[in-house]
């Protein structure tokens, strides 16, 4: 429908801190250290973890090149929650994010937040491999590895974590300065962190592979993906320095393979959604380089029915991205005729309609589909089509409902702000934009916008009272976040 990519963040800094890297490390033999053991993770309560998670998610939204594509976000969250439903010791809600980055990586941090790099779609051969990475990261969260690491560092180097967290924030404003600060902070404790990390990685593998099996995926996917990473490490000439803190020794691969071999062999087919998501991620994202190659599409064309449909969808997507709308429509039409309620097809058909200035066609198509199957992605598409078609009031009606039930989706607030602007509802436009700023961690700007909205609202009105109450809420949030902004 639409893409909103934001400023770059050195996300690997968070990955190093969160102990959740899936990429292999290049370490010399001396990096294989004795087991340091684990602590009880008593540094943070669950409530504190969630509060810190909220703070860092907002920073991530405001600085990272997040992919806010509604279809891809819906897919990775559905896949992630399928895995979470089969995990033990789940104490927080989970949220899954996708970053536009061509380096293989994933990381987990406070409060059940898991971030995937878009490159994973390029390297994962099947859905089970992608799920294996997510199960590994989910296990970092359920085992509270970050809290346990903070407890360990509290004893051995109490200032390290404060400095590292502060360096992450610095990196959001100045990547080079942030990297230098983080390198200096961690230099004195590198050996201890490597040892602790290796133990966490093995534990996340062990628990993650159990989650993978329970959720109905192929447990062999975990060792097969680890082996792919190790092979890439062997043949790479200039590995990223950050990988030095995340060793992937042969013993870790062997342990994962042994555990998978003890489980009952299964044949698991990747879902159609996996192939559609892979085509979309490779065709529209991956750091601006189209990696939806002809070779891959030709390979899918010779595969099973799901792969064949994904190949045709991918070709239609490529044509649409190249503004070849007639070709895109012709390629997509057989798929859409066979499955008129398929969200992937409907979304692409909407983009084609809007690209050809046929907003009414998009509106009629989406209204019919939405009546059959209520889907948040299609609601956003319909609201966007109404806006493009000059019907902001209809868009406003949809978006008021949408933002009420999806308060953390910046797409909804951004579209609502556009609708209110078109309707000349200045105070409501400012309030909607304020919510977008708040989600991105820009609380001062959000409060300023809400103050302006309150000043423009009718004196003593319910709207004014609502804006003032929201200002109070955001000020309270600022107070709760103060300890983290000082790091």
UniProtKB/Swiss-Prot annotation:
Entry GO terms, CC: membrane; periplasmic space
TPR repeats: 309-342, 427-460
Details of cofactor binding: Binds 1 zinc ion per subunit.
Active site: 137, 205
Keywords of the record: Hydrolase, Metal-binding, Metalloprotease, Periplasm, Protease, Repeat, Signal, TPR repeat, Zinc
Pfam families listed in its UniProt record: Peptidase_M48, TPR_19
Superkingdom of this protein's organism: Bacteria
EC number in record: 3.4.-.-
Localization, UniProt: Periplasm
S-S bridge residues: none
Keyword set includes tRNA processing: no
Record-level GO BP terms: chaperone-mediated protein folding; proteolysis involved in protein catabolic process
Binding site for Zn(2+): 136, 140, 201
Cofactor: Zn(2+)
Signal peptide per UniProt: 1-27
Molecular function, one GO term: metalloendopeptidase activity
Keyword Chaperone (UniProt): no
Membership in a protein family: Belongs to the peptidase M48 family. BepA subfamily.
Job of this protein: Functions both as a chaperone and a metalloprotease. Maintains the integrity of the outer membrane by promoting either the assembly or the elimination of outer membrane proteins, depending on their folding state.
PANTHER family: METALLOENDOPEPTIDASE OMA1, METALLOENDOPEPTIDASE OMA1, MITOCHONDRIAL
Name listed for the protein in its UniProt record: Beta-barrel assembly-enhancing protease
Species annotation: Salmonella typhimurium (strain LT2 / SGSC1412 / ATCC 700720)
Gene assigned in the entry: bepA
């Amino acid at each position: 429908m639409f893409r909103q990519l934001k400023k770059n963040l050195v996300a690997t800094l968070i990955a190093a801190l969160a102990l959740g890297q899936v990429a292999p490390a290049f370490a010399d033999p001396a990096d294989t250290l004795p087991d340091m053991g684990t602590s009880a993770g008593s540094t943070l309560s669950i409530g504190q973890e969630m509060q810190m998670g909220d703070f860092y998610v907002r920073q991530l939204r405001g600085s990272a090149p997040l992919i806010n594509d509604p279809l891809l976000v819906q897919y990775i969250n559905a896949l992630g929650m399928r895995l979470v439903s089969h995990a033990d010791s789940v104490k927080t809600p989970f949220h899954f994010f996708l970053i536009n980055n061509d380096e293989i990586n994933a990381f987990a941090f406070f409060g059940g937040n898991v971030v995937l790099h878009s490159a994973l779609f390029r390297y994962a051969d099947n859905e089970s491999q992608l799920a294996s990475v997510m199960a590994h990261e989910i296990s970092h969260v359920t085992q509270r590895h970050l809290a346990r690491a903070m407890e360990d560092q509290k004893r051995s180097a109490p200032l390290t974590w404060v400095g590292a967290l502060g360096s992450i924030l610095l990196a959001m404003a100045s990547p080079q300065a942030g990297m230098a600060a983080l390198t200096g902070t961690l230099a004195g404790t590198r050996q201890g962190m490597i040892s602790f990390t290796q133990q966490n990685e093995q534990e996340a593998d062990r628990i993650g592979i159990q989650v993978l099996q329970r959720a109905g995926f192929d447990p062999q996917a975990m060792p097969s993906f680890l082996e792919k990473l190790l092979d890439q490490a062997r043949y790479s000439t200039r590995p990223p320095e950050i990988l030095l803190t995340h060793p992937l020794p042969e013993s870790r691969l062997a342990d994962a393979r042994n555990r998978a071999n003890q489980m009952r062999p299964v044949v698991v087919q990747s879902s159609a959604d996996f192939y559609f998501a892979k085509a979309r991620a490779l065709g529209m994202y991956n750091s601006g380089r189209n990696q939806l190659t002809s070779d891959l599409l030709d390979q899918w064309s010779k595969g099973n029915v799901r792969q064949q449909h994904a190949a045709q969808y991918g070709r239609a997507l490529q044509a649409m991205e190249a503004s070849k709308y007639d070709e895109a429509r012709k390629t997509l039409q057989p798929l859409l005729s066979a499955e008129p309620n398929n969200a992937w097809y409907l979304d692409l058909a909407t983009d084609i309609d809007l690209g050809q200035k046929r907003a009414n066609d998009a509106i009629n198509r989406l209204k019919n589909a939405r009546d059959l199957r209520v889907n948040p992605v299609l609601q956003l598409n319909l609201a966007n089509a109404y806006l493009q078609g000059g019907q902001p009031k209809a868009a406003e009606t949809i978006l008021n409902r949408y933002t009420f039930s999806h308060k953390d989706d910046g797409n909804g607030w951004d579209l609502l702000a556009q609708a209110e602007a078109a309707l000349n509802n200045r105070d409501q436009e400012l309030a909607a934009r304020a919510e977008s700023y708040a989600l991105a961690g820009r609380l001062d700007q959000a409060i300023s916008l809400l103050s302006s909205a309150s000043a423009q609202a009718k004196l003593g009105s319910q709207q004014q009272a609502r804006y003032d109450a929201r200002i109070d809420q955001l000020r309270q949030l600022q107070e709760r976040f103060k300890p983290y902004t000082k790091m």
